[in-house]
Amino acid sequence: MIIIFDMRRFLICAFLAWAVAPFASFAQYTAAVLEINSKDGVYAVGDSIKVWANVTPECEAVQEFTVQEDMLHDILKQEMRLAPGRHLVYAGVCSKPVNYVFTFGKSGADRDYKKASIVGAIVAPETMRPGYKAPKDLRKFWDNQLKKMRKMPLESKLTPVPQEYNPDIVCFDLEIPMPEGAPVRGYVAYPKNADLKSLPIIIMAHAAGVKGGWCQCKVESVVKNASRGKGTIALDINAHGMLNGQPQKYYDSLEANELKGYSSWDFTGHKDFYFRLMYLRMVRALDYAVTLPQWDGERVFVYGESQGGAQAAALAGIDSRVTAVNLRVPAFIDVAGLYQNRKGSWPGKYSADPKKYAKILPYYDGAVLLSMSRAKMFVEAGLVDYTCPPSCVAAGFNNAASTDKTIVFFPYRPHHENRMPKDIRKRWSEEVKAPREKFREDYLQ
């Protein structure tokens, strides 16, 4: 159990000029700034953990300090009155694997960066394991799903798409019929004069939602991916089989009607579980990509953020042709976190009651599917991400069969990077985004 200072006694001292830790991390809040003694927020059992509050004269007289374990359990909630200065507000010894979230700000700020400073820590992430175990027939189940899908001959409809981003790249609107549900839809692009067997494949999957710009395939994005390295076969596949390039009212209507609340739809079995066909569309897209004569026959890189990370993890687990994967704060990784007494991953409806869905969800949980993947892997987790908790991401990472894998944590990252203050985003770009981009660029050279 972590050791906590007696705050009443401690706060008799209005200010203590503690030396800045050599690897201190900082979060932004206009009135106060939290700081921890670990650059990446990762600790081992037995390590000392310290949290300071740097209080400005603009800080309101009364602030609330909270400590939460595994994004479920408040272990400390205390009102504080601090004079301007730097104050040690928490100290202890890490005694077990756990994710901590520290919040200092206005009462009831609820992790709002505009009202509080927030920082996270994770202890012994390498020991964390998923809530669900792999079903004995996991491989057989997906092999049967692929066999049924492939009974339908692979056909593709390609429509040239004019683009001005790179004159050396050709781009097409892509549609591939499926035996069930919506077709695969997206864009494919590659260099005009590429040699046979010269290009890797890169597939982008999209985050959750329907009408948002982040949910839709973009010509600019696929052309940019096709231009990477010495050129690639780039696919940008949307999650739902939506038409590309439609007026916004088309996507608004889908979100309000046919696809409303899709991530929390109930189901009776595999057949009506929405994510089954979402994952199969990813495989079908790859089935098409590997038929292109420009493919080098070896490299397949897939990446995505949030729900896109779920799709990327699924494809890496289901399909051994995937050789490298980048998972960015991935969703649907350890939805059964409650089995380990921690918050489970998105989708929230399923993680709130993992026992109810235990006969179906293990076949789709990325933490389970990654047990079948030997792909080279780079994974990112945010230590204050309540949508895709870092303990869940760590559990999935640990469960991956890959022996060439890297995970990075960032102590101030919530689920959406643009919610971090500007100075923190700059640090994140240097410490997380830069190595993430290098991982991709090195692989695609």
What are these regions (language model features)?
Residues 197-209:
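Short beta-strand element of the alpha/beta-hydrolase
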Residues 208-280, 337-345:
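Cap/lid segment of the alpha/beta-hydrolase catalytic domain
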Residues 394-445:
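C-terminal catalytic histidine-bearing segment of alpha/beta-hydrolase fold enzymes
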Residues 217-218, 375, 389-398:
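Short alpha-helix in the alpha/beta-hydrolase fold that links the catalytic acid
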Residues 383-388:
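Acidic catalytic loop of the alpha/beta-hydrolase fold
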Residues 373, 379-381:
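Short beta-strand/loop motif that positions the catalytic acidic residue
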Residues 246, 309-356, 409, 419-420:
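Hydrolase active-site cap/lid region
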Residues 37, 41, 150-194:
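N-terminal cap/lid segment of alpha/beta-hydrolase-fold proteins
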